[in-house]
Amino acid sequence: MHKIIDSGRKRAVKDTATKKETLRFIKWLKKGKNVLYAIDQDYGIKHSKKINFFGIPTYTITTAERLQEITNCNVVFLDSWFEEGVLRINLEEISKNNVIASTEMISQRIESSIRRNPGEYLWHHKRFKSSLGKEFYKDAR
């Protein structure tokens, strides 16, 4: 499955990096390149903070803010949705606050986007597995 996903991504972008290749992101950002990073993933507890997501304290990665601290890059929230068959895109710069405030702000933007168009959110990636446990998803099959 990873090969299929990676192949699709490489058709649309110049290069990809895995969650374990943060150094590649840092190099790209220091060179002034743009990076798209989906921060609403659950990569576990180690590099996460508990942030409310739909009222549930949820482990949320803080990588975007850490990359901002290291490279002084801008963090921009990209929201996209279809409206009457037209792709709409909204970009919003996330201010350089502290890690928790920035992560909370991004989580709030994701919540708003999901509330507007819940059918367009990628629900299958188990967003709550570190917070609620993997058992939470066993009945969802």
What are these regions (language model features)?
Residues M1-K33:
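Conserved nucleotide-cofactor-binding alpha/beta core module
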